């Protein structure tokens, strides 16, 4: 098991941290502030994919820029991730793509879900980390839980083509 310091070095391209302060605590305070001020659940979607990656052989060297709200609350600068905040249970759930060693060979280290691996949780301070495949099921449960509220907050990058 890597030390937190080594984890920060390993994932420095996808998780913003500083040796001068506890970045996990900064992001946790921001999420706690949001949880205290929400009256329904909220979804923060990071950018859905890396620039130019939607078709084979179109990878570009365009710099990836994360959705600002997601980055502000998590410090994660990686495509395909979601954060769900639930004020009723005061919970925060992070959804990340599954660990993909083949992709990491080509694009560098990435945060990823791996069964019985707590690296993402240790790095971000978010205890409930799940694979993105579980996002829809969690969303469905939250919609039922908040059915009387009549609304939810969603901050996401619109990928629909008109």
Q: Predicted regions: what is each one?
A:
Residues 1-162:
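A composition/biophysics-driven feature that prefers long, compositionally simple stretches
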């Amino acid at each position: 098991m890597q030390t937190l310091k080594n984890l920060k070095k390993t994932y420095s391209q996808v998780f913003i941290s500083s040796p001068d302060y506890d970045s996990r605590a900064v992001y946790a305070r921001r999420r706690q502030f949001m949880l205290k001020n929400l009256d329904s659940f909220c979804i923060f979607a990071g950018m859905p994919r890396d620039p130019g990656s939607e078709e084979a052989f179109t990878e570009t060297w365009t710099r990836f820029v994360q959705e600002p709200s997601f980055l502000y609350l998590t410090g994660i600068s990686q495509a395909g991730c979601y954060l769900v905040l639930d004020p009723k249970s005061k919970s925060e759930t992070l959804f990340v793509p599954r660990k993909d060693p083949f992709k990491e060979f080509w694009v560098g280290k990435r945060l990823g879900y791996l069964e019985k691996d707590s690296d993402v949780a240790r790095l971000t301070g978010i205890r409930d980390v799940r694979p993105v495949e579980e996002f829809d099921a969690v969303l469905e449960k939250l919609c039922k839980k908040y059915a009387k509220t009549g609304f939810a907050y969603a901050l996401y990058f619109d990928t629909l083509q008109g």
